[in-house]
C-alpha cells in the first residue's frame, strides 16, 4: 500500500520552473499525510523576503546566493535536523542552491553548502526540454529568473543534475511531460522502497537511478 514510507527519509523535489514541481508536491501531500513538507527558500519571514527579492528584486546573483545560504543554514538547523526521524519532502534543496549559484566557483559552492545543509537521501529531478519549456513559458508571466531565457534555464537544469551527482545523492530523473499521475506513482515507488536511498558514494558513481534511462531500454 502506497503512502507508508519508512521514517527518516529526506526527499528533495527538484527541477527548473514549469516542470511541475508544485503539482507533484500537492499530490504527495495527499499521499503522505503525516510527512513534513517544506521548501527552499524556507516559509518563514526571512525565506519569503529572499524569495521575493530573487523573483522580483534587483540584487546581484552573488548577494542572492549568500542570502539563500543563510536561509538554508537556518532551515536545516531549525526544521530539517530536528525532524530527521520523519519523512521530509522538500520543494528544492541545496541542489538548487548550488545549481543557481553560477556566480560562485562550483566546487566552492559545493563545499559551502555541504557545511551548512543536510544532504537529501533522494533527489527527484523533473526534467524538461527546449520545446516543452518554450511552450510552458509562453503560457505564464515570467519572473526575473525565467526572463533570463530558455538557454539559461536549460543550463540550470544541467547544473541541477551535476550538483546532485557531485553531492553523491541518489537521483530519480523523470521527464516532466509524462502524465502527472504516472510521475506520482514513480516517485512514491521510490520513496516507499525499503532500500537505502543514498547509494552514490562519489561524483564518479554511476549508481544514481534514472527513470529516463530505464524507460529507454
Region locations from a protein language model:
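NTP-dependent small-molecule kinase module
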Residues: 2-5, 131-217
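Hydrophobic positions on the alpha1 helix immediately C-terminal to the Walker A/P-loop
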Residues: 24
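P-loop (Walker A) phosphate-binding loop of NTP-binding proteins
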Residues: 16
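Pre-Walker A (Motif I) flank of P-loop NTPase domains
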Residues: 6-10
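Conserved lysine of the Walker
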Residues: 21
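ATP-dependent small-molecule kinase phosphotransfer cores
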Residues: 36-114
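Hydrophobic anchor at the beta1->P-loop junction of P-loop NTPases
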Residues: 13
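A glycine- and Lys/Arg-enriched "phosphate-lid" helix/loop adjacent to the NTP-binding pocket
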Residues: 97-158
Amino acid at each position: 500500500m502506497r503512502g507508508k514510507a519508512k521514517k527518516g527519509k529526506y526527499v528533495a523535489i527538484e527541477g527548473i520552473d514549469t516542470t511541475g514541481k508544485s503539482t507533484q508536491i500537492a499530490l504527495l501531500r495527499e499521499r503522505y499525510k503525516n510527512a513534513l513538507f517544506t521548501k527552499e527558500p524556507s516559509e518563514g519571514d526571512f525565506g519569503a523576503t529572499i524569495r521575493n527579492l530573487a523573483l522580483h528584486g534587483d540584487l546581484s546573483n552573488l548577494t542572492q546566493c549568500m542570502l539563500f545560504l543563510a536561509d538554508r543554514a537556518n532551515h536545516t538547523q531549525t526544521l530539517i535536523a530536528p525532524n530527521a526521524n520523519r519523512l521530509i519532502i522538500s520543494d528544492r534543496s541545496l541542489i538548487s542552491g548550488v545549481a543557481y549559484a553560477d556566480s560562485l566557483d562550483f566546487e566552492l559552492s559545493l563545499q559551502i553548502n555541504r557545511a551548512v545543509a543536510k544532504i537529501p537521501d533522494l533527489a527527484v529531478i523533473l526534467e524538461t526540454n527546449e520545446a516543452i519549456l518554450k511552450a510552458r513559458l509562453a503560457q505564464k508571466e515570467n519572473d526575473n529568473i525565467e526572463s533570463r531565457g530558455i538557454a539559461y534555464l536549460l543550463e540550470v537544469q544541467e547544473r541541477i543534475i551535476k550538483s546532485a551527482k557531485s553531492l553523491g545523492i541518489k537521483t530519480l530523473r523523470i521527464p516532466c511531460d509524462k502524465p502527472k499521475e504516472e510521475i506520482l506513482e514513480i516517485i512514491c515507488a521510490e520513496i516507499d522502497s525499503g532500500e537505502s536511498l543514498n547509494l552514490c558514494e562519489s561524483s564518479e558513481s554511476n549508481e544514481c537511478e534514472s527513470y529516463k534511462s530505464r524507460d529507454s531500454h
